[in-house]
Amino acid sequence: MSFDVGALVRARGREWVVLPESNDEPGLLLLRPLGGTEDEVTGIYLPLETVESANFHLPDPASDLGNHLSCGLLRDAVRLGFRSGAGPFRSLARVAVEPRPYQLVPLLMALKLDPIRMLIADDVGIGKTVEACLVARELIDRGEVRGLSVLCPPHLAEQWQKALAEQFHIHAELVLSATAARLERSCRQDESLFERYAFTVVSTDYIKSDKRRDEFLRTSPDLVIVDEAHTCAAAPGRSASQQRHELLRALVAPNTEDGASRHLILITATPHSGNEETFRSLLSLLDPRFASLPVDLSGEENRKHREGLARHFVQRRRADLEAYLDTVTPFPQREIAESHYTLTAEYRRYFDRVLAFCRESVLDDTLEKRRQRVRWWSALALLRALASSPAAAAATLRSRSATADGETVEQVDEEGRRAVLDLDEDNAEGIDVIPGTETGEEEAGERERLLRLAREADTLAGKGDAKLARAFELVEQFLGDGYAPILFCRFIPTVAYVATFLREKLERRGVVVEAVTGLLPPDERERRVEALGAHDKRVLVCTDCLSEGINLQQHFDAVLHYDLSWNPTRHEQREGRVDRYGQPQKKVRTLTYYGQDNPVDGIVLQVLLRKHKAIHKQLGIMVPLPSDSEVIEEAIQQGLFLRGESPVQQLSLFPELDKLWDAAVDREKRSRTLFAQNQLLAAVNTEVRAELDEVRRVIGAEADVRRFTRTALRTLGAVVSGDEPLQVDLRETPRALRDAVGHGERLSAVFSGQPRKGSLLLTRTHPVVEGLAAHVLETALDSALVGPARRCGVVRTSSVTLRTTLLLLRMRFHIVNQGRDGKERPLLAEDLVLAGFTGSPERAEWLPSDSLEALLDLGADSNIDAEQARTHLRRVIERFEDLLPRLDQIAEARGKALFDAHRRVRKATKSGVRALKVDAHKPADVLGVYIYLPAAMGELR
C-alpha cells in the first residue's frame, strides 16, 4: 500500500504524517509524529510493520474543554512548530533567525533568475551572510539544489560553518588543508569528497591549486557562495586572485552543461577596488556580457545595460535600511573620536636618527634600480614598524627584508606593496608579519648599524614609550565607561608587547587581556575570543587577522586603532567588527590614535584617513583607496624622505593624490546612482511587504514567539518576570515540560538581537520554543494529559451579538515539483487556517477570514456552566458533516493560493524547476472548535 506525502497514517499505536523523503527508498516510510518535532522522525519498513490510513478525530467536549486562552495557545503552538510552512518562502519555517525585511530583497531578486547569479554588495554589518544563506536554504527546501559549497578565506571557514548550522540548519563539512585528508579517507576509491558531502565550506586557497581545482570543477554542487568575492576578481600582477577568478569562471562556464546551470552568489562589501577592469571581471561572473559593458553607463541609450545589471546586483547603504517597510533595525550609533600622543624626547631623537638613516639609504642614487627599490621598501617597513612600537622596530631591524628575494624590480615592488602599503585587498591573512629591513647586501658596518639601532629600540620599550602609556589611559577610560575594547595593531610583535603591558597593569583589577595574531590557526583565534567573552571585564589586542569577516559584536563594543592602517578600508573593516546589526549596545566607540609629532602617522592621517572619513561623512558611503599605488608611494616619499625637516603640520595636501580621491568619489557616486535599482527595488519592496505578511501569518513572527512563550510558561506554572531578558523559573512546572524545554530549572532569554552572556536568543526554531510548542500541542491532543491548551471551549463575551463558532484547521498539502532532470520531487507544506461562522452548522453564515483573528483576543465577560458549554459544543460537533463541503472549499482555495505563491516568487522557469501541482489533503484536521456566545445569552438557541 502506498501513501501520499502529507497523508495521515497510524502505526505503533499513534498517528504520523508521511514525509517527502519516503519516496527515496522503496518500502520505507519516513514519518513524523502528529504533533511531534523533526527530532522524532522515524523510518518504518513496510514489509515488517503494519501502517494504516488514519483520520484526525474531532474534539471531544467531555474531555477537551478549555478556557478562553485555549485557542490562541493551540494556534501558536501549531504554527510555531511548522517546519514545512505553506507560505511563499519555504525556508523561513526552518531558519533560526527572523530576517529583517530588507534581507528578503536579495532572496526575491535571486528567485527571479535562473540560473541565480547574484552580487550582494551591501555595506559592512548589514548581514550579507544571512542574505546569501536565505537563498541557499530556500533552494534546498524547494528541491532545486541538492548541494552547496561556500568558498571563503580559511580564517572565515569555521564562522561560516557555525552560521550555516546554527542559523540555517545546514550542516557543512570544512574542507581545509588540515581537514581534507580526513574527509577523503571516508570516500570510496572513485568518489570525490564533494560527492560524498553535499554541504561544504571550502578554503579558496586550498581549492585553487590545479589538482584540487579540477576535482572541484568535476564534482562541485549546483550552488556556490563566494565570500570576500573581491579577492576573486582578475587583477594584473596578482597571481592568487587570478587563480581564484579562473576557478569561478570555469565553474559558471556557459559552454558546459553544469556551468551554464550552476547558481553563484558573490558576497563583498567592496566590489569596486577603483580599477574598472577588475570590477568588470567580477561582473562577468554574473553574465559574460557584463565584461564588455560601457565604462559610462549613463544616458537613455544604456538603460537596458543598467536594468540588466540591476537584476543581478544589490548594493545598499546602512542608512537606507535603518527604517525599511515600517521595521526599524537597531544598528548601533557609532561615536567617532581621535586621540594623540607626543613622543618622548628620547624616542624623538631615536626616530630622527632612524629617519636620517632611511633617507640616506633611499636617496643613494649610485645603486642599480632593483637594489634601490629593495632599500625603499626596507626603509618604509622600518618606519612603519617604528611608528608601531619599539618591539616591532627591533624585530624589523633584525629580520631579512620581505622584498630581498625579488629578482626583478616588478617582483620587489609587488611584494613591497603587499607587505608595507596594506593595498592587498585579498585578505588580512599574513599581513601582520614583520616585513624586515636587512637586504642581505649590507656591508659589515651597515649591518652593525642596523643591530645597534635594534638594541636602542629595545631600551625604549615601556617607560620610554609615550604611545603605550597614553594608550593605557585610553583603555582605562573605555573600561571605566563600561566598554569592552579591541586594540588593532599592525604587527605581531606589537600585539605581544601591548598585551603584556596591559596584563601587568590590569589583571590585578580583574580585567582579562587576550592577544590574537595570525600566528594562531583560525579555530584557535575563535576559541580565544569566545573564552575572553566569558569575562565581565575584557580587552582584546589583535592584528588585522580579525579585521575581516569575524563577528565580534557580541563581546566587544569599542575599537582603538593602536596602529593606523595605510588603507582606510581596513579601518572601516576593523570598526565593522563591532558596529553591525546584532550589537547589543546602543552605542559603539571608535578611536583613531596617532602620534602628534610622528611623521609617519602624520602623512597617513593627512592624505589618506581624514580624507576618507570626510568623504564617508559627506556621502554616507565607503570609497575605496585610489588604486594607483605609485601616486600613493610618491606622496609618502615626498612627505617622509624629500621634505627635510619640515614639520608635519605644514605639509600641504598632495595634488596628485587629491585628484585620485576626487576621481574615486565621482566614480562611486556615479556607480551608486547608475546601479541604484530604483524602479526594480520599488517593485521588489512592494512584493516583500506582501509576501512578508503572508509568511508571518503562516509561521508566526517574533511577536508571536514572545507572546506564546510568556503565556504558555505562565499557564504551566513557571514564574516569569522581566522583559529583556526574560527570567524564567521552572521549578514548579511539570517534569515533562522541563524535559521538553531541556534547559534546567532556570533560564534567561531575549527574543531579538544578540543575547548577553548567560541569556538565550529564543527564535521559533530554538529548542526551548520548539520543545514548549511540542509540549503544549501534545497535551492538547491527548486528553489524558494536563496542559494549558484544549481543543474546544465556550466563551461568553459582549463582543459578539450572535453565536459565533471558530474552527482551528490544520491543512497539509502535497506539492509535486519537477527538477532539472525531469523527475518529480514531492514536497510537504502545512498551513494553519481559521474558519468561522455564525448560527448553527446546518444554516451557517460564514465569516470573512480577516475578521477572525480578533476573536482569539476575546476574554470571558461572565462564566458559563461546564455542562452547558459541552452541550453547545456537542450541537456543533454532531452536525459537523454539514460543514465539510465548505471546509473542503477552503482547503482547495488555500492549495491554489499556495501554488500561485510558489510560482509567483520563482518566476524564472528556464531550468524547468517548477511546481506542477498542489494537492490538499482532505478533510482538513480540525484541531479546535471554539464557540463565542453573546454575554446576554442565558440559554441555548
Question: What residues fall within each predicted segment?
Answer:
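Inter-lobe coupling linker of SF2 helicases/translocases
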Residues: 189, 196, 201-221, 233-414, ...
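Conserved Helicase C-terminal RecA-like lobe
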Residues: 136, 330-343, 372, 384, ...
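Hydrophobic positions on the alpha1 helix immediately C-terminal to the Walker A/P-loop
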Residues: 131, 135, 278, 470
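A short beta-strand element within the Helicase C-terminal
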Residues: 220, 278-281, 551-563, 589-592
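Conserved segment of the helicase C-terminal RecA-like domain
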Residues: 579-609
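SF2 helicase/translocase NTPase motor core
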Residues: 44-73, 78-108, 115-116, 128-133, ...
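SF2 helicase motor core recognition
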Residues: 209-210, 273-275, 541-556, 576, ...
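P-loop NTPase motor cores of the ASCE clade
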Residues: 387, 405, 417, 430-435, ...
